Amino acid sequence: MRRMPLIAAAVVLAGLSTLATHAQFIGQRVHDDFKDTSILRPPAGSEVAIVVFEDLGCPLCARAHPIEVQAAQQYYVPLLRYDFPLAQHIWTFNGAVCARYLQDKVSPKLADQFRSDVFSSQRLIDNKDDLQQFTRRWMQQHGQQMPFVMDPSGSLAARVKADYDLGLRLNVTATPTLVVVTRNNYQVVCGKNNLVDPTQLVPILRAAIAQTTAAPAKPAAKPRAKQ
């Protein structure tokens, strides 16, 4: 009669042990409230990746952005960007559509530069008209003609919305939600449980690489918005 409680206790302790180690490469486990974590995986051919859900008008996203880019380049891991425009930032959905236009119609490299420049120029953009003026000037400076209608079919907006819906499935509640992922594990850097320090990305990334059986041996794809 006394063995059953002992067995049950052992099962509970084992479960707690699993919870304590899941989703951490360094430090103690943080409760993240994520739901569908199936998207927290590196792309084919990579063992480790950086995943970020970001809003172009988010000040902390602007702070995290150069750290993410530098870490991805230094450690040869993919940087997977998902657009998560917040409702209170009335221009950022359109900004994400502009970035998608550049990615599809011009070049992914120029789209990456546009995102970087928007982040660094947030103080100049308060509304959709400001974004329009910024984008027109930016395109002229980069030898591009701004189209009269950026997204006539609505396909680019649909892809931004698809990113946002993925964030809802994951239960993204803040930006940036920044996560280091491997094939069977992940750790949140920013976006959950008051984690707001993007400088923790590098130590977490290094720990994740160390824990994989084969770290990436050559440069991965350049940072890109998720298709």
Label the predicted regions.
Residues 44, 51-54, 59-61, 208, ...:
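N-terminal Sec/ER secretory leader and immediately downstream segment
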Residues 8-17:
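Bacterial N-terminal signal peptides
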Residues 43-45, 73-74, 91, 169-174:
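Extracellular/periplasmic catalytic domains that process cell-envelope and extracellular macromolecules
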Residues 18-23:
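Sec/Tat signal peptide C-region and signal peptidase I cleavage site
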Residues 30-48:
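A short beta-strand-turn-helix
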Residues 51, 56, 62-138:
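Structural alpha/beta surface segment adjacent to cysteine/selenocysteine redox centers
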Residues 1-8:
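Bacterial N-terminal signal peptides that target proteins for export
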Residues 136-227:
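C-terminal cap of thioredoxin/glutaredoxin-like
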